[in-house]
Amino acid sequence: MQEALALFFGSESLLVGTIIPFLFVLTVVVFVHEMGHYLVARWCGIGAQAFSIGFGPELLGFTDRHGTRWKLSAIPLGGYVKFIGDESETSSPVGVNESALSEEDRKRAFHTQPVWKRAATVFAGPAFNIILTIAIFSVFFALYGRQIADPLIAGVQPGSPAAEAGFEPGDRFVSVEGEKITTFADVQRIVSGRAGDKLNFTVERDGKMVDLQAVPKIVERTDPLGNKVKLGAIGVETTEAVGNFRRIEYGPLESVGQAVIETGHIIGRTGEFFKRFAVGREDKCQLGGPVKIATMASKAASQGFDWLIQLMAMLSIGIGLLNLFPLPPLDGGHLVFYAVEAIKGSPVSGAAQEIFYRIGFLLVMGFMGFVLFNDLFAC
């Protein structure tokens, strides 16, 4: 009996050690996403019937003075805002019966609004996820600054791509693929996502500029949360003495600026990853689903609250970007319909939307099944 209780309630138990950290991170990210939809909808004069964290039967809730039902539902793996006139939680316009709405509700219904209001409301969810990531990074930069090193090579691994390309200790990176380099981390950021690509480097050597080419090879590393990650590397390193390791501190505005830059880098790396993944150049095990996220949440929580919040930032931008994929019922799929409507001056036909919703739903479910299979069996 005691062993059973420890399994679920001990500090390293399934409940306290894994489920609670996972639900904490996921709930905050989902709440911010749905709050983005809700707030912009309110600003646009759109009425909301329900704001739910989770799906399925309601566990608890209340109705506010605007008639919106705020609730916590039984299945805590997501959430939704149901607007006036919605037939489902996905805000699909297919099957909407406007004749059943009162005149007042028709004015506040989602699907009767101008296309720009609908697009703004839909885009707000992913946008708020990105804003959450920027906000978290801003706080971390303000509190802890950033550890940097000069882009100087202290050593070249024998037989590595860098050795074959002619890199030498003492070389200073000036640019990679035309992008200016100011820190050693800049080189790592660019190279890590370009395994197998021939990259152009410019280094400063004895006061002269030298152009080199190298093809990063895949190396497997273990990140701070214990995940096996595959990255591109050319086989150079720096040291504290050569790289002049130091910490830069930032003021409030500088922290926000650095957070925006860091978030932009993550968006760029994510886009590059999926382009390479689509043509079979990335490892499928780099994609994970709820089981992997729960495992990461557990490991992050065991290392401290700061780690859990950093994971929240990464999950938030991941969910934001995923929702911008141009597939219904994701937000990006809605935005495609609104873009077509804005161009042609009339909505996409109900029949066409129904077809795309079914195709999109199957693709989204297939992707979810794929990452879950990775979690449980393949990786």
UniProtKB/Swiss-Prot annotation:
List of catalytic residues: 34
UniProt cross-references to SUPFAM superfamilies, sorted A to Z: PDZ domain-like (SSF50156)
UniProt keyword Disulfide bond, yes or no: no
Single GO term (MF): metal ion binding
Compartment(s): Cell inner membrane
Family: Belongs to the peptidase M50B family.
Protein name (database record): Putative zinc metalloprotease BR1156/BS1330_I1152
Species this chain originates from: Brucella suis biovar 1 (strain 1330)
Record lineage: Bacteria, Pseudomonadati, Pseudomonadota, Alphaproteobacteria, Hyphomicrobiales
